[in-house]
Curated annotation (Swiss-Prot):
Statement: the UniProt record of this protein carries the keyword Transmembrane helix: no
Lineage, uppermost ranks: Eukaryota, Viridiplantae, Streptophyta, Embryophyta, Tracheophyta
Main localization (coarse): plastid
GO biological process: translation
PROSITE patterns named in the record: RIBOSOMAL_S8
Protein's UniProt name: Small ribosomal subunit protein uS8c
Membership in a protein family: Belongs to the universal ribosomal protein uS8 family.
Single GO MF descriptor: rRNA binding
Keywords assigned: Chloroplast, Plastid, Ribonucleoprotein, Ribosomal protein, RNA-binding, rRNA-binding
Protein's cellular compartments: Plastid, Chloroplast
Amino acid sequence: MGRDTIADIITSIRNADMGTKGMVRIASTNITENIVKILLREGFIENVRKHRESNKYFLVSTLRHRRNRKGTYRNILKRISRPGLRIYSNYQGIPRILGGMGVVILSTSRGIMTDREARLEGIGGEILCYIW
């Protein structure tokens, strides 16, 4: 039985978002690095740095904070395709979250990308998660 690293990322970010923590430490793999880069580019997290600790690499990401208020923005992250039930979609069937305000992260033959990038390139893939 393997680990679901994508679900681990989502759970870590969600737990840190609910609490008062502003930072999340995630084990670094190629998939996690690509997903965190997308989250950084889309503005869901503020900062990411790579940290080495006893021959293992971790990504330390800072969550985005509200101005003039305590706490972070409440982002909703939902895992869609999971190891027991894979969900695939062609580029025409990729769902739009909140009319395009949310982000769908896909795993395609050209790497991990957002729904907008996949529609522009005209490729579909496995729907990993929704973020809004």
